[in-house]
Structure formats: structure tokens, C-alpha cells
Amino acid sequence: MQQRAFDVVQSAATRAAFELEREGPVTRDRYGRHKFGQSCLLARRLIESGARLVQVNWPREPNDSEVGNPLWDTHQKNAERVRDVLCPQLDSALPTLLEDLAERGLLAETLVVVMGEFGRTPRHNASGGRDHWGHCFSVALAGGGVRGGQVIGASDRIGGYTADRPLRPQDLAATIFHLQIGRAHV
């Protein structure tokens, strides 16, 4: 298994996947000319090259120094950051990734998981931000055998606690293992 992993990393197809300049400007623009968008494009290229697991982290943009808290860790100015910085990047990159995978016939065999490690407090703090909150958060799944158009579970009216069908991290892990890994790999 270790040799197989090394062979994948060292393959010409994997090395070529990192050459984003091989993509046309229209495709690169569709993903968004920001780090997250180009990281999603790289993820698609790595999947095409045969990678079995790709994790896309959300890198901080070099000019993003508006607040001390990076990325989705919105302890300050939550509404402004989500509206002006974060959602526009997510809204360009994620749908484009899903469309590209579908057009290439890869979405059915690729599970896309969008999540953070916890949620945010239901109410703003004194700095207009939201702090860490482990009681309730959202995860999105697409492709890989997931039937789309579903919402499973619900929060209370302020998004503070689960109100219907609470799921735990181990439930998500079991779903991922069931959909993508199967018994042959456990």
C-alpha cells in the first residue's frame, strides 16, 4: 500500500495536475482567481489524475488582513466577512467543482464533503463576530452516492441546538465509510 501511494504521488499524471496553467482562463475564472477557487480546481485535477483522497483547506488570501481572525473563524465582523469575502469565494468555487466533476463523469464516484470542525455561536458577540460553538453546525455532502436535495436534521429557531434528528461526528464518519471506502478498505 505504501508503494502504491508513493507511485501515485510520483506519477507524471499527478505532477501534471499541479500545473494549473494548463487550464484555460475561462475555467480558472469560473473557479475564482482566489486561493480557495484555485485549490478546488487543483482538487479536480488531482481526482482526474487518480488521487483517492483530496483535502482542500481554505487558505487565507495575502491581502486579507481586515481582521485578526482568519477565514471562517469570524470572531469579529461576522456578517461583513461572510457576505463580502467568504461566501463569494465559496459561491464561485464549489458549484464549479461539482459541475466539472459531473461533466467529467467523476461526481458519482467522488464524495465532496464541505465542513468545518464546529459551528458558530447563534448570537453575535460584542465585536460583531461569532465564537466557537460545538452544539450545532452544518455539513454538506454531494456526489459519491449521496441523494441530493435533502436536508437531514434541523436546528432550533436560532441555530443554537439540534431540534430534529441530531447527528454526531461518528454518524458522518460512518456515512463516509459506507459511501466511499466500503468493507474492503476497513
Regions found by a protein language model. Give the residues of each.
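Ligand-binding pockets and gating/stacking loops
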Residues: 1-183
